[in-house]
Amino acid sequence: MTEHSIRNFSINFGPQHPAAHGVLRLVLELDGEIVERVDPHIGLLHRGTEKLIEVKTYLQATPYFDRLDYVAPMNQEHAFCLAVEKLLGIEVPRRAKLIRTLFCEIGRLLSHLLNVTTQAMDVGALTPPLWGFEEREKLMIFYERASGARLHANYFRPGGVHQDLPPGLIDDIEAFCDPFLQVVDDLDALVIGNRIFKQRNVDIGIVTVDAAMAWGFSGVMLRGSGIPWDLRRAQPYEAYEEMEFDVPVGKNGDTYDRQVIRMEEMRQSVRIMKQCLAKLRAPDGQGPVTTQDGKVAPPSRREMKRSMEALIHHFKLYTEGFHVPAGEVYAAVEAPKGEFGVYLVADGTNKPYRCKIRAPGFAHLQAMDWMCRGHMLADVSCILGTLDIVFGEVDR
């Protein structure tokens, strides 16, 4: 019998694949049904964000961050605002801190709802995304009532937030919380307890503690392996040090553990939201929502009607922008997908000299080849879904 050289089979996964979660192209090398190699091709959504920020003022640069992880926009703005505030050395009013914390947790719900339900859809369950999007719609309306926009909010500004919450919004968010917990329980029973979902996800894409550290993972990818690292707890920012919440961690580091953690994080987010709402109602939660420094934040409309100086401040702020002292700073937040960091270099002018964006999805996607080797072709979409990738932030 003559020997035949067996050649591996290469296929393209994407860029328009329904399970690719964006414009991802994977070149898969298969031996039968077993994945031998995965070659991710990124950059199909590259828009040159970091370079664009260098020619915009600090205020004009803020909306670019909404367009990175567009599933939870305000969490990205948060990191940039923290970086600018560190360089300016300004203190954010307490009410603004509470509003920021509240909307960051709403962003976490938006992201986790989308991820858990669409990953269930990749596995074959069609009901969860329909339930999840119904809840996301309510949260989008809260975004819209606070900022005027459902998606690209541009609500967080250096020095605070753009405007105070409209009357009645705090009551409506509070009315949303308890029924939402019931929806989370229903999703938990439908997805996490599902026999088929378990068969598709348990012991798939296992990440050990050492591997998670070596690949530079953060967020749920790190906690799924049993490392209790959460920036909200480890390096508290804004009002998180006042909040009581638990950090759920996994045991096995597989795709199933990561989805269980995301479900539990939604419950913890609601817990934080309730505390924020109570503090916003308290007497010490009242007051301004942006810094009173006229060089950084615009004056009130009332001031502008009366004062020539306020009008000049307003004009200079929106034409030239504020000048940030020369220096460099790294600010990171616990975004829903992991540690989202902004390394900002200022040269004393009104524009950033350099703004490096550290996207968690980028670090997670680089391990795709390592995680998929030896798995079946059908497991690739399970692993990709649990990485929680959004291409706005990967390609930037």
From Swiss-Prot:
Cellular component annotations (GO), alphabetically ordered: plasma membrane
Keywords attached to this entry: Cell inner membrane, Cell membrane, Membrane, NAD, Quinone, Translocase, Transport, Ubiquinone
Signal peptide per UniProt: none
InterPro entries linked to this entry: NADH_Q_OxRdtase_suD (IPR001135), NADH_UbQ_OxRdtase_49kDa_CS (IPR014029), NDH1_su_D/H (IPR022885), NiFe-Hase_large (IPR029014)
Subcellular location: Cell inner membrane
Membrane topology: Peripheral membrane protein
Chief subcellular location: membrane
Pfam family, one: Complex1_49kDa
Keyword Protease: no
Reaction it catalyzes: a quinone + NADH + 5 H(+)(in) = a quinol + NAD(+) + 4 H(+)(out)
Enzyme class: translocase
Source taxon at top rank: Bacteria
UniProt-listed Enzyme Commission number(s): 7.1.1.-
GO molecular function (one): NADH:ubiquinone reductase (non-electrogenic) activity
Annotated family: Belongs to the complex I 49 kDa subunit family.
Function: NDH-1 shuttles electrons from NADH, via FMN and iron-sulfur (Fe-S) centers, to quinones in the respiratory chain. The immediate electron acceptor for the enzyme in this species is believed to be ubiquinone. Couples the redox reaction to proton translocation (for every two electrons transferred, four hydrogen ions are translocated across the cytoplasmic membrane), and thus conserves the redox energy in a proton gradient.
Description of how the protein assembles with itself and partners: NDH-1 is composed of 14 different subunits. Subunits NuoB, C, D, E, F, and G constitute the peripheral sector of the complex.
Protein name: NADH-quinone oxidoreductase subunit D
Organism: Methylobacterium sp. (strain 4-46)
